[in-house]
Amino acid sequence: LHALQHRGQEAAGITSFDGKEFHTHRAMGHVAGNFDREDIIRALPGSIAAGHVRYSTTGETSLRNVQPLYADLATGGFAVAHNGNISNAVHLRRELVQRGSIFQSTSDTEVIIHLVATSAQKSLLDRLIDALKQVEGAYSLICLTPEGMIACRDPLGIRPLVMGRLGETIIF
């Protein structure tokens, strides 16, 4: 996250999964200030994690918009970190609210969570595919689930999404 600090200076967050439960730390400010204490790092156990630095393009600058965002869905835990702009987020949000969704943030990222949660598909992967078919714009995102990590990007590949390897570790 330190290497990505230049992409967002408002806030930073990390969500990890330890095989049983998700753990999240999100805070306003820089990565160095938010993750400089050993107790914070120890509170994020697991073999899989997603981090995010925030630069607001949609939604107010507040803690409730700091990513990764997390929700307990019918299919299990679901965390998402998103880079980009969902151009039809206002329209989708309005439809979701009319159908009973209750939003906790003003971030367009939360629209993805609600689309996944309300999808009629059975599996989480099929729900995510169904959700992203409704989304317009330029984006890349990382989703954490109890089964692992899912990486997605917009159909035109406008937003960067890079995968690499560091030893035995895969990094996006």
Segments the model singles out, each with a brief description of its role:
Residues 1-172:
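Conserved short alpha-helical segments that host acidic/polar catalytic motifs at enzyme active sites
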